[in-house]
Amino acid sequence: MIVLVNLKDGVAPDDYERWLQDRYVPAVLDLASVDEWRGYRVSSLLESGGDPPYQYVVSVEINDLDQLGRDIDSERMQMLLGELGRYADVTQLITERFV
């Protein structure tokens, strides 16, 4: 899964990143359906003078989509997803590796 992230107005990047490191990422990595979580700051566009359309990109290695659905329904994850919604707008893309 690829997640595209933009912070909401007024959210400081340091606050968001600290919340990710302290609360969100450890919980996601505890999920049976997730093997890996990697977050990236987007700094610029290659060969373009414009601003990047997203501030962060996250890759999540999921081993079982059905299990992910069950994992996300847990009380802990619902609470954390609510917190995430206060920090950022996210677009989640379910992807399949082909190369």
Question: Predicted regions span which residues?
Answer:
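Macromolecular interaction modules
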Residues: 1-99
